[in-house]
Amino acid sequence: MSISIKDVARMAGVSPATVSRVFTNGPVSDDLRKKVEAAVKATGYRPNLSARRLRSQHSSTIGLIVSDIRNPFFTTLSRAVEDAAYRADMRVVLCNTDENPAREAMYLRLMQEERITGVIYAPTRATAATLGAMDFDFPIVLVDRAGPSGSQDVVGIDNAEAAGLLVDHLVAQGHRRIVGLFGNTSSTAVERHDGYAAAMARHGLATDAGFLAPAADAAEAELMRRLADGERPDAVMASNGLMLLGLYRGVRRAGLDTPRDIAVVGFDNESWTELVGSGLTVIEQPVAEIGRAAMDLLFERLRTPGMATRKVMLAGRLVVRGSSGARAA
């Protein structure tokens, strides 16, 4: 037999309204609260969370929408967000979009229907461009990827500057023909491309960039295609960790050596990058700090809904390893 709130009230010797106030942290004396909590424990009653949401008009849940949790960047980000939510006695619901705008729209609609408290979100470029015109009952903080200037709170790194650091380092090592491979779904990749292009122009070098699916297989296939066509650049740069993995797989598959035959650099200081060969040169992003800062900004937005939108930019760090060594004579 199911236990109802009336059963709890009867055992505690209070009214159902008092039990409800205990569940919603309403004004109840300590003595009555203890009686209700004891009755809940004795009966094994579990509050109806959906009903509580209807009464309070919001949940105690944070939505986290990312492209793919298998991307180590988002794995680390998710843990930081969940830890911050736990400390605030809140839950996190995780959604993977697979870079699909239709799937994004479905999850955003779900968040609205579930009266979510707020959302941490890494949107595709297509959705980010229209976010400012959308009307939500909850605040959104973007991570890693930006929307239209000033339309949303955002936390990330200076992507253009970080890409420029990689180019400057490669040029200092004597590399001139530097290929840049960038994802085709996010504003982050566009910003990194722009930083790459600006740095190449600053050094008087021609750009050679490609936009493709932000995945390991796509990056590997693109490198193999270029090598089959007789194009072997001095160096190749990937705009995210999954693409960097694909590039390294392609280099190994082609029987090439880094950095003797080709230099390889990219983004995200994942654990495997220091274990392969002489190690891969990367931009390290403060991912956990990004997650914590996003949650801090979301809580601030909840406390002060009318505050001006903020853009929090953290610094990426160049980690130099053997894969970007001096170009062979």
What are these regions (language model features)?
Residues 42, 83-88, 136-142, 146-329:
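Bacterial carbohydrate/catabolite-sensing allosteric modules
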Residues 98-101, 122-127, 242:
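Short beta->alpha connector loops
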